[in-house]
Amino acid sequence: MEEPPLREEEEEEEDEGDEGDEAGPEGALGKSPFQLTTEDVYDISYVMGRELMALGSDPRVTQLQFKIVRVLEMLETLVNEGNLTVEELRMERDHLRKEVEGLRREGSAASPEVNLGPDKMVIDLTDPNRPRFTLQELRDVLQERNKLKSQLLVVQEELQCYKSGLIPPREGSGRRREKDVLVARASSASSNKEEKTIIRKLISELHLHGSCCQGREEGLPS
Amino acid sequence: MAKKTYDLLFKLLLIGDSGVGKTCVLFRFSDDAFNTTFISTIGIDFKIKTVELQGKKIKLQIWDTAGQERFHTITTSYYRGAMGIMLVYDITNGKSFENISKWLRNIDEHANEDVERMLLGNKCDMDDKRVVPKGKGEQIAREHGIRFFETSAKANINIEKAFLTLAEDILRKTPVKEPNSENVDISSGGGVTGWKSKCC
């Protein structure tokens, strides 16, 4: 009835204790000091008291009896205190264990990537402005943009030369570019006649001054 | 019948911290205009301006880089083809001045050894907000043996002078034998493989 509340792995020890009880009060003296209960201390005091009584009423025995009682009281206090402390710590441990499990479950549910490395970043997939493209893709796009820009500048320059009469029209032959002219025509079906003419001129001009154009192209940014 | 629209082609590069005004400096030079809205340059851009020096038509192909750290791997690959580099800081921004040594190190690491360098202290119209004295700019330029100008893209101070001086310095180093403009090889290399013309 005075047994301290034991659980789980301690149940075995409790059983052993019971066995000890079955072995009689003397069994308590054979127990490990770490498994002693106050019950055991009472058993021990019962055994010792019985033996002291058997020694008779010699005053030396009486004197010794006081000391033994004192020592047994100290043992009782220690065992009691120890068991209480163990029980308290056990409760505390179980409580913390439950709390950790709860937090862990909560954490994994909320953000599965809590354990990111120091050089990682989290991307919000619902953010319409989230990063999507790689540096290489940006590099490629920029290169293409700059290439097209430089080609446009070349074409504008050529056009300017043409407009200002530096290059006489119909110079040489643009026949080999006929296909491109057709393509240009098809792709600009909606544009008016004047625009078509400019495209035709441009293309034949590009062809005419091919070497010039190419030279500059090579000189252009890459 | 190739016509010649220029005698020489010089490739220049603008570098410096984000927001010091590299794009504005270039815009002032190429278009003689100024815009107060700040739009961070994405990676790299360029403009072309033809000038005449010592009777030669010189086409300046000026590369404008993004100052932001995140574009550095892209921008540094453009250093190598540059014949002249303008390093720009902002006289109202001490950090941009402190970073000059970092930019100079970048030049040492990525540009041609004989590249012509120039230091520009921009926004010199904002004297009330100045934190970098002109003398400090001059001093660091002297230490590195490079030219220095204080400029203002907004007030159009020293912009053309800076570009023309840099072009002259490059012209001075250019071999007397004038290269055929059609074959000027200024392909930047710079980690980016040159693309071949498909237009002809």
Swiss-Prot record, chain B:
Pfam families: Ras (PF00071). Its cofactor is Mg(2+). Regulated by guanine nucleotide exchange factors (GEFs) DENND4C and RABIF which promote the exchange of bound GDP for free GTP. Regulated by GTPase activating proteins (GAPs) including TBC1D21 which increase the GTP hydrolysis activity. Inhibited by GDP dissociation inhibitors GDI1 and GDI2 which prevent Rab-GDP dissociation. The modification Phosphothreonine is found at T73. GTP binds at residues 18-24, 35-36, 40-41, 67, 122-123, 125-126, 152-154. Its EC number is 3.6.5.2. It catalyses: GTP + H2O = GDP + phosphate + H(+). Changing Q68L: Probable constitutively active mutant unable to hydrolyze GTP; accumulates at the base of the primary cilium and alters the basolateral recycling pathway in epithelial cells. It is a lipid-anchor. Expressed in the hippocampus. Expressed in neutrophils (at protein level). Expressed in the testis (at protein level). There is a cross-link at K102, K136, K154 (Glycyl lysine isopeptide (Lys-Gly) (interchain with G-Cter in ubiquitin)). Ubiquitinated upon Legionella pneumophila infection. Ubiquitination does not lead to proteasomal degradation. Phosphorylation of Thr-73 in the switch II region by LRRK2 prevents the association of dRAB regulatory proteins, including CHM, CHML and RAB GDP dissociation inhibitors GDI1 and GDI2. Phosphorylation of Thr-73 by LRRK2 is stimulated by RAB29 and RAB32. Phosphorylation by LRRK2 is required for localization to stressed lysosomes. Keywords: Acetylation, Cell projection, Cytoplasm, Cytoplasmic vesicle, Cytoskeleton, Endoplasmic reticulum, Endosome, Golgi apparatus, GTP-binding, Hydrolase, Isopeptide bond, Lipoprotein, Lysosome, Membrane, Neurodegeneration, Nucleotide-binding, Phosphoprotein, Prenylation, Protein transport, Transport, Ubl conjugation. It comes from the Eukaryota. The keyword Cell division does not apply. Belongs to the small GTPase superfamily. Rab family. Switch 1, switch 2 and the interswitch regions are characteristic of Rab GTPases and mediate the interactions with Rab downstream effectors. The switch regions undergo conformational changes upon nucleotide binding which drives interaction with specific sets of effector proteins, with most effectors only binding to GTP-bound Rab. This is Ras-related protein Rab-10. The gene is RAB10.
